[in-house]
Amino acid sequence: MVIRVYIASSSGSVAVKKRQQAIVGFLEANRISFEEVDITMLEDQRLWMYQKIPDEKRPEKGNPLPPQIFNGEDYCGDYEDFFQSKETNTVFSFLRLPSVKDSES
């Protein structure tokens, strides 16, 4: 399974850009393999992302904003979920990856 971070390269929102950069930077710094999927360039990927996000994670109005994180077809969460997992030191579990300890055994 591959981690996919759905981003919007042409977002006009500074907050969205900072959140995207925070996730990508963390994954790169921790050498976690991932793909960026730009939903502004790939209509089919944007629609796929929207369909796969659980109802309870959708906003009352409009569409979910990037960044959104998936492991293969499994939805992991959005920026808030990612941030919470960083704060509680559960990022590997959040991403549905074996922990560093598991891979060292």
From Swiss-Prot:
A motif (SH3-binding) lies at residues 61-67. The keyword Metal-binding does not apply. Keywords: Nucleus, SH3-binding. It comes from the Eukaryota. InterPro entries: Glut_rich_SH3-bd, SH3BGR, Thioredoxin-like_sf. It is found in: Nucleus. Pfam families: SH3BGR. One of its GO terms (cellular component) is nucleus. GO terms for molecular function: SH3 domain binding. CDD domains: GRX_SH3BGR. The keyword Nucleus applies. SUPFAM superfamilies: Thioredoxin-like. PANTHER family: SH3 DOMAIN-BINDING GLUTAMIC ACID-RICH-LIKE PROTEIN, SH3 DOMAIN-BINDING GLUTAMIC ACID-RICH-LIKE PROTEIN 2. Belongs to the SH3BGR family. This is SH3 domain-binding glutamic acid-rich-like protein 2. The gene is sh3bgrl2.
